[in-house]
Design a protein with these regions (language model features):
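Extracytosolic ligand-binding ectodomains
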Residues: 1-164
Length: 164
């Protein structure tokens, strides 16, 4: 396309981003390409604590996927603790409850565990993930934040942050 003189607006997702993409294309050929990828809520206090601990352990900042995975594990652990029994049906009944806005906002597993240990139920908890609030939609999917990235001068530049 580029070498033939055809100009088109290119769009992609996180799988289209990588150093090799730019290294393997002529300078300027990708300029203007826009990508949308999941984003962690940088600046959010519990995310920053998570990111600092991650960086201390691994020597680099975490990806958004690291934050999502962490929240998945915490949400699963809280569901297991809050459920009446360890079955798929029982866990499915409480997984949304431990993240509902009607509960008390908690930012760590330890805070949520304390509520359950004091006789509270899943309904009493609103776990706020390191990846942002975890409010499941009608399909059971968590809402998330996105970053819009544009290739400028043959480099990736974050141009916009959108909370879902």
């Amino acid at each position: 396309m580029y070498s033939g003189g055809y100009e088109a607006q290119l769009y992609g997702a996180d799988s289209n981003r990588g150093d090799s993409v730019l290294e393997d294309t002529p300078e300027g050929s990708m300029d203007g390409m826009k990508l949308v990828e999941p984003a962690a809520p940088e600046g959010q206090e519990n995310y920053e604590a998570f990111a600092d601990a991650y960086e201390n352990e691994h020597g680099e900042r975490p990806t958004a996927w690291s934050a999502f995975t962490y929240d998945c594990v915490v949400t699963a652990a809280l569901s297991i603790e809050a459920a009446d029994e360890f079955t798929g049906a029982a866990l499915g009944d409480v997984v949304r409850d431990v993240t509902r806005p009607e509960g008390e906002e908690v930012f760590t597993y330890e805070e949520a565990h304390a509520i359950l240990a004091d006789g509270g139920s899943a309904d009493d908890i609103d776990y706020q993930g390191v990846s942002g609030p975890i409010d499941f939609d009608e399909n059971g999917d968590p809402r998330g934040s996105l970053v819009v990235i544009e290739v400028q001068d043959h480099d990736y530049v974050s141009t916009e942050f959108r909370e879902a």
